[in-house]
Amino acid sequence: MRILFIIIQLTLILSACAYQQGKQGQNVEKESTRQQETKPIHVKDTTQETKDNGTRTDIAKHLVSVAEKNPDVKDATAVVLGGYAVVGIDVDDTLDRSKVETIKYSVAQALKNDRYGANAVVIADPDTVSRLREMSREISEGHPVTGILDELAAIVGRVLPEVPNDVIDNEDEPQTKQQNDQLNRKQQQEMEKEQNDQSDHHMKKNNND
């Protein structure tokens, strides 16, 4: 009788342990399922390209504002893409080439002193400026940038722009001009002296004769 009682107790104890283990297993499974449901899913940030476009657009607008501060610039546009920053300016059609180059130089100097425009390229060719404006619109509309980037690189390689990093400082230009003027005056004086010497020589020779 005592042995039977012990067997019954052992059976109850084992059943209770098995029940407790099963309950714990269910709790662990439920907790794991709950964590999976609440755990954030990491996916590719599809807005990154939009953010990049926004940044490029903001910089382009800033470069346009810098260029348009020049009173001789009627309108401006800019495209910032990849490693390129190209600024196109509209000027008076009646201006001669030298005046246009002077305006380009002035705009390039302004961009050189700007943190976003130090490597910008300035162009004033009407057709190219018009195309730049179209490219800017295409970028803002979300068109693929690969083809635009290739075309932008071709524009930079085709035109002869003012590159602000390579522009000579304003302080150097007057000095160079002054040196050239001094050299020209010196050469002129030497030529006049030589002519006077030759004239004196001929006069003395004629007197001796």
Swiss-Prot record:
Specify the superkingdom: Bacteria
Residue ranges, annotated region (Disordered): 26-54, 165-209
Annotated lipid attachment (S-diacylglycerol cysteine) = 17
Lipidated residue numbers (N-palmitoyl cysteine)? 17
The residue range of the signal peptide is: 1-16
Q: Keywords, A to Z?
A: Germination, Lipoprotein, Membrane, Palmitate, Signal
Q: Where, if anywhere, are coiled coils annotated?
A: none
Q: Does the keyword Signal apply?
A: yes
Q: Which GO terms describe its cellular component?
A: membrane
UniProt key word Glycoprotein: no
The biased composition feature labelled Basic and acidic residues covers 28-54, 183-209
Q: Which Pfam families match?
A: Spore_YhcN_YlaJ (PF09580)
Q: Where in the cell is it found?
A: Forespore inner membrane
Q: What happens when the gene is disrupted?
A: Mutant shows a reduced rate of spore germination in L-alanine.
- Membrane topology value: Lipid-anchor
What does the entry give for GO biological process? sporulation resulting in formation of a cellular spore
Chief location bin: membrane
Task: List, alphabetically, the InterPro entries matched.
Answer: Spore_lipoprot_YhcN/YlaJ (IPR014247), Spore_lipoprot_YhcN/YlaJ-like (IPR019076)
Q: What does this protein do?
A: Probably contributes, directly or indirectly, to early events in germination.
Designated name of the protein: Probable spore germination lipoprotein YlaJ
What organism, scientifically named, is this protein from? Bacillus subtilis (strain 168)
What taxonomic lineage is listed for the species of origin?
Answer: Bacteria, Bacillati, Bacillota, Bacilli, Bacillales
